[in-house]
């Protein structure tokens, strides 16, 4: 129902407009207050790059974070990642992830990023605290924040907004009448706009999510996704239909799909009933990190990687880090 309202296909959004005006007024005031210095913000000694979005729901931020981290590592830089850790509940913050950290503690996306990239990852409600914890523990030269575009308490040097190219901004209204955390004109002040699928507009960078090889959660076996035969797909992400459609576009024959809420916690029983005849069950890599400890032989996940048509973002971020490092070096002389 909420997707229908946000897409502009229902007039029910009119009932929610008073709440949206309030949300928008608070959002605008907070950003203005930070710009004027009425609310304090903290500046990191190393560059901070924010990968965020203007809308609620999944847009492809995490694959962009992983892509950027991997590219920076390949160039010899030392990146780390901070996150709010949505869906996780830790006894203490900031929390530095380790190989044993579970999604229930740190959140599914931070755990996924940690295992995919191997770089230091920290989570905390205050991203500034997470950055400070990382800098106290590691020698770093850049921080990437997964989400956090609206977390103005942490100053940033470069802003990347990721847009779902198919849904874009829906009806354009602030939450809850629409999907917007901030209005579309906010794009005028960011450094880069990446569009995940769909058509790009002027000055936007096209991105696709590529992945053809499924991995078995239980055994680690790898197999072409099309070789799994008739399968069931499940997803607990911001926009599950995108995942289901991508599987069908790759030629996967889906006999059923099951959408869960984003950041859902799963049980063995509720997933087993999805495949009563032991059909292959395909899930996202984000879901897989939460199901690994009770995985079954017929469970598979599909890793995907972001592919950008334009590498200007990487070049600009690399130059940012290089310039900051040179400045620090010169000041020490």
Curated annotation (Swiss-Prot):
<dbReference type="GO" id="GO:0009244">
    <property type="term" value="P:lipopolysaccharide core region biosynthetic process"/>
</dbReference>
<comment type="function">
    <text>Transfers the gamma-phosphate of ATP to the 4'-position of a tetraacyldisaccharide 1-phosphate intermediate (termed DS-1-P) to form tetraacyldisaccharide 1,4'-bis-phosphate (lipid IVA).</text>
</comment>
<dbReference type="GO" id="GO:0005886">
    <property type="term" value="C:plasma membrane"/>
</dbReference>
<feature type="binding site">
    <location>
        <begin position="55"/>
        <end position="62"/>
    </location>
    <ligand>
        <name>ATP</name>
    </ligand>
</feature>
<keyword id="KW-0067">ATP-binding</keyword>
<keyword id="KW-0441">Lipid A biosynthesis</keyword>
<dbReference type="GO" id="GO:0005524">
    <property type="term" value="F:ATP binding"/>
</dbReference>
<protein>
    <recommendedName>
        <fullName>Tetraacyldisaccharide 4'-kinase</fullName>
        <ecNumber>2.7.1.130</ecNumber>
    </recommendedName>
</protein>
<comment type="pathway">
    <text>Glycolipid biosynthesis; lipid IV(A) biosynthesis; lipid IV(A) from (3R)-3-hydroxytetradecanoyl-[acyl-carrier-protein] and UDP-N-acetyl-alpha-D-glucosamine: step 6/6.</text>
</comment>
<keyword id="KW-0808">Transferase</keyword>
<dbReference type="Pfam" id="PF02606">
    <property type="entry name" value="LpxK"/>
</dbReference>
<keyword id="KW-0443">Lipid metabolism</keyword>
<keyword id="KW-0547">Nucleotide-binding</keyword>
<comment type="similarity">
    <text>Belongs to the LpxK family.</text>
</comment>
<dbReference type="InterPro" id="IPR027417">
    <property type="entry name" value="P-loop_NTPase"/>
</dbReference>
<dbReference type="InterPro" id="IPR003758">
    <property type="entry name" value="LpxK"/>
</dbReference>
<keyword id="KW-0418">Kinase</keyword>
<keyword id="KW-0444">Lipid biosynthesis</keyword>
<dbReference type="GO" id="GO:0009029">
    <property type="term" value="F:tetraacyldisaccharide 4'-kinase activity"/>
</dbReference>
<dbReference type="GO" id="GO:0009245">
    <property type="term" value="P:lipid A biosynthetic process"/>
</dbReference>
